[in-house]
């Protein structure tokens, strides 16, 4: 279940608020410029190709490109048996920003976005059918868990703008990781 847990950065051991209602999640994130939505499920085979996935969601992707100016879309997928899963997980576990929006739609599986706003951290467990757009410049990090299992559509205005710029802050190491917040989901 999609879950938003809100932490105070000085009390990272306990969430102040936990929300599972999609409309409430949408409203809380929107207050910080983060777009959250849910798309209808599409029937896709487990081994669907990038082309099949993009075709299944062609209308939604085209709408985002038109409304938000995205130029390209691709599909990223990671499974627990990937030989570089640990390196991929580590790559985005530290707080960073991007010079363009980070947009992900979860075709299957799940992942945990942490969004740092002032003295609060919003931990959003995204699941199948969730769309999130993190505005450029937003301090955040992503945890796919020790046994990743997800497929996402990514949208870009400029893929070079998506390079992570790390903040050097240690806040990500003080918050509960995927293993704690996903609850074995």
UniProtKB/Swiss-Prot annotation:
<comment type="pathway">
    <text>Amino-acid biosynthesis; L-methionine biosynthesis via salvage pathway; L-methionine from S-methyl-5-thio-alpha-D-ribose 1-phosphate: step 5/6.</text>
</comment>
<keyword id="KW-0533">Nickel</keyword>
<feature type="binding site">
    <location>
        <position position="102"/>
    </location>
    <ligand>
        <name>Ni(2+)</name>
    </ligand>
</feature>
<dbReference type="GO" id="GO:0005506">
    <property type="term" value="F:iron ion binding"/>
</dbReference>
<feature type="binding site">
    <location>
        <position position="140"/>
    </location>
    <ligand>
        <name>Ni(2+)</name>
    </ligand>
</feature>
<feature type="binding site">
    <location>
        <position position="102"/>
    </location>
    <ligand>
        <name>Fe(2+)</name>
    </ligand>
</feature>
<comment type="similarity">
    <text>Belongs to the acireductone dioxygenase (ARD) family.</text>
</comment>
<feature type="binding site">
    <location>
        <position position="98"/>
    </location>
    <ligand>
        <name>Ni(2+)</name>
    </ligand>
</feature>
<dbReference type="InterPro" id="IPR014710">
    <property type="entry name" value="RmlC-like_jellyroll"/>
</dbReference>
<keyword id="KW-0408">Iron</keyword>
<keyword id="KW-0486">Methionine biosynthesis</keyword>
<protein>
    <recommendedName>
        <fullName>Acireductone dioxygenase</fullName>
        <ecNumber>1.13.11.54</ecNumber>
        <ecNumber>1.13.11.53</ecNumber>
    </recommendedName>
</protein>
<feature type="site" description="Important to generate the dianion">
    <location>
        <position position="104"/>
    </location>
</feature>
<dbReference type="GO" id="GO:0019284">
    <property type="term" value="P:L-methionine salvage from S-adenosylmethionine"/>
</dbReference>
<dbReference type="InterPro" id="IPR011051">
    <property type="entry name" value="RmlC_Cupin_sf"/>
</dbReference>
<dbReference type="GO" id="GO:0019509">
    <property type="term" value="P:L-methionine salvage from methylthioadenosine"/>
</dbReference>
<dbReference type="GO" id="GO:0010309">
    <property type="term" value="F:acireductone dioxygenase [iron(II)-requiring] activity"/>
</dbReference>
<feature type="binding site">
    <location>
        <position position="96"/>
    </location>
    <ligand>
        <name>Ni(2+)</name>
    </ligand>
</feature>
<dbReference type="Pfam" id="PF03079">
    <property type="entry name" value="ARD"/>
</dbReference>
<dbReference type="GO" id="GO:0010308">
    <property type="term" value="F:acireductone dioxygenase (Ni2+-requiring) activity"/>
</dbReference>
<comment type="function">
    <text>Catalyzes 2 different reactions between oxygen and the acireductone 1,2-dihydroxy-3-keto-5-methylthiopentene (DHK-MTPene) depending upon the metal bound in the active site. Fe-containing acireductone dioxygenase (Fe-ARD) produces formate and 2-keto-4-methylthiobutyrate (KMTB), the alpha-ketoacid precursor of methionine in the methionine recycle pathway. Ni-containing acireductone dioxygenase (Ni-ARD) produces methylthiopropionate, carbon monoxide and formate, and does not lie on the methionine recycle pathway.</text>
</comment>
<feature type="binding site">
    <location>
        <position position="140"/>
    </location>
    <ligand>
        <name>Fe(2+)</name>
    </ligand>
</feature>
<feature type="site" description="May play a role in metal incorporation in vivo">
    <location>
        <position position="95"/>
    </location>
</feature>
<keyword id="KW-0223">Dioxygenase</keyword>
<feature type="binding site">
    <location>
        <position position="98"/>
    </location>
    <ligand>
        <name>Fe(2+)</name>
    </ligand>
</feature>
<feature type="binding site">
    <location>
        <position position="96"/>
    </location>
    <ligand>
        <name>Fe(2+)</name>
    </ligand>
</feature>
<comment type="subunit">
    <text>Monomer.</text>
</comment>
<dbReference type="GO" id="GO:0016151">
    <property type="term" value="F:nickel cation binding"/>
</dbReference>
<feature type="site" description="May play a role in transmitting local conformational changes">
    <location>
        <position position="101"/>
    </location>
</feature>
<keyword id="KW-0560">Oxidoreductase</keyword>
<dbReference type="InterPro" id="IPR023956">
    <property type="entry name" value="ARD_bac"/>
</dbReference>
<keyword id="KW-0028">Amino-acid biosynthesis</keyword>
<dbReference type="InterPro" id="IPR004313">
    <property type="entry name" value="ARD"/>
</dbReference>
<keyword id="KW-0479">Metal-binding</keyword>
């Amino acid at each position: 279940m999609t879950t938003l847990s809100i932490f105070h950065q000085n009390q990272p051991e306990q969430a102040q608020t936990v929300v599972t209602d999609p409309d409430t999640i949408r409203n809380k994130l929107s207050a910080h410029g983060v777009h959250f939505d849910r798309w209808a499920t599409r029937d896709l085979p487990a081994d669907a190709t990038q082309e099949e996935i993009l075709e299944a969601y062609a209308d939604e992707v085209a709408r985002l490109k038109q409304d938000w100016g995205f130029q390209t879309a691709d599909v990223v997928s990671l499974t627990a048996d990937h030989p570089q899963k640990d390196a991929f997980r580590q790559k985005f576990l530290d707080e960073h920003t991007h010079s363009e929006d980070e947009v992900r739609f979860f075709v299957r599986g799940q992942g945990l976005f942490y969004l740092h706003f002032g003295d609060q951290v919003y931990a959003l467990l995204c699941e199948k059918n969730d769309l999130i757009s993190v505005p450029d410049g937003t301090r955040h990090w992503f945890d796919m868990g020790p046994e990743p299992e997800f497929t996402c559509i990514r949208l870009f205005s400029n893929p070079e703008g998506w390079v992570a710029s790390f903040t050097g802050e240690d806040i990500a190491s003080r918050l509960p990781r995927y293993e704690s917040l996903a609850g074995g989901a």
